[in-house]
Amino acid sequence: MSGETTRLTEPQLRELAARGAAELDGATATDMLRWTDETFGDIGGAGGGVSGHRGWTTCNYVVASNMADAVLVDLAAKVRPGVPVIFLDTGYHFVETIGTRDAIESVYDVRVLNVTPEHTVAEQDELLGKDLFARNPHECCRLRKVVPLGKTLRGYSAWVTGLRRVDAPTRANAPLVSFDETFKLVKVNPLAAWTDQDVQEYIADNDVLVNPLVREGYPSIGCAPCTAKPAEGADPRSGRWQGLAKTECGLHAS
């Protein structure tokens, strides 16, 4: 891919975020994605264009997916065929998650951008010692998730996430649209108001791909060493970083 990235200035992005928050209060997920596409879909993009399976699309926003399911991917692809979808390949994912990523790229009209850290797991072990995730999980997440994502998002004016308010107490007030103070771009959360029932109904009605681990009792899926099955009825994210003073990986700090 070739070409120059076109990204709006921070004042422009802040203004658009405020406008979107006002205009989209109570909007459906599809309406939010349409607004995102109308606002950011044709003003330049990473590398001057992203190749979709069935053609080329120029897009100045990106969708992020942890590959737990393809609900957001399905919604976004219907609005913008060929939309770029970021997957943070930390090197620690379950085999099932990698398989879901590959299946999603095959089934949906999207382009999966496989984003990797600067160092492989083996290189990180050599530099910082084995199993950094157990000794300093915040630093491990920073190196393998936050930094790589930040570098990738520099090429875009907005990112779309699957963040939901019911996921955890830390996400209870997640806005639909905001300016992301961490990555300095517009952040859109089309599923923020969705309940678990909303997700399940959409999956059933649209035959959406789901990570096999979800069926096995993992409602929140991250890196394999830091993900366990939560107790029945517990916070869905309580299986993440069990025994550690950590509840978020740092991607959704703002």
Swiss-Prot record:
Reaction(s) the record says it catalyses: [thioredoxin]-disulfide + sulfite + AMP + 2 H(+) = adenosine 5'-phosphosulfate + [thioredoxin]-dithiol
Disulfide bonds: none
Pathway note: Sulfur metabolism; hydrogen sulfide biosynthesis; sulfite from sulfate
Note accompanying the cofactor annotation: Binds 1 [4Fe-4S] cluster per subunit.
Record has Cytoplasm as a keyword: yes
Cofactors: [4Fe-4S] cluster
Molecular function as annotated in GO: 4 iron, 4 sulfur cluster binding; adenylyl-sulfate reductase (thioredoxin) activity; metal ion binding; phosphoadenylyl-sulfate reductase (thioredoxin) activity
GO cellular component: cytosol; plasma membrane
Database matches in Gene3D superfamilies: HUPs
Family that this chain belongs to: Belongs to the PAPS reductase family. CysH subfamily.
Protein name, per record: Adenosine 5'-phosphosulfate reductase
